[in-house]
Amino acid sequence: MGAKEEYLENLKSFWPQNAPDISQVSKYVNKYKKEKIVIKCGGKVLIDPDLFDKFIEDVSVLHKLGLKVIIIHGGGPKIKTELAKLNIESEFINGLRVTDKKTMEVVEKALVDFNAEIVEKLSKKICKAEGLNVSTNNTIIVEQENKNLGFVGRPKKILNEKIQVVIDKHAIPVLSPMGKDDDSQKYNINADTAAAAVAKSLKSRRLLLMTDVEGVYDENKKLINEINPNEAKKLIDKKIVQGGMIPKLLNSIDAIENGVRGVVIIDGRKLHSILYEIFSDEGAGTLIRK
């Protein structure tokens, strides 16, 4: 058996069903093996057990192929459920959750618990991972976004060395979207904003933002496969995109203009969307790049 055949046989041992064509994988591995890939996990993936399991499986495949993956997870649906139990209603301004002290306590617990769950699930896939959260190992230095939003922070600095220590252990860093300011006050961060800040700081090759839609739509409600930052700005200016997609696009544009080669807003509801985005020309959403 030749080296190529042996490689494929090994790959088949962990390559999922209904994933992209296995014969094309090696060329994409060569493309990404020296790069970093930041993945923001959010939306329905967080609450649908099957989608969550597929997400964990996809990440473990990337790891087993030797790719450097960094995960930033959201917690919107879980936070919403916990707040509802306590009869706490959330207000949103431009897609960002207004966070008072009581809300902050709920947000922190939900995010820390979910962080631990992701690490545990990955370990069961024989995939070493390490949680980096605001309670035990803060990685994001923030400043307050604005007073109207309460305890919502904007990333000011990413402590790259903490992330690199985990990568050097051949483990996956799993980050919660929270940070501390210079006075150690904790702040909630929009998960897309946190992911973009990490991707910029690490100069990652790709940033994948998982959503509950196919990607970005044009004025005719058709999926846009690829778009550049200027075209993305026009979609916002013309109010073609609204709600939670606005911060996603703004963060994507910011990331592209600060060293990230490509940002993909991908459909997290599609099975193995991460593998289709990384290992095929088919993709799984909207690619934003220059």
Label every PLM stretch briefly.
Residues 1-269, 276, 282, 289-290:
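Nucleotide/pyrophosphate-binding catalytic subdomain
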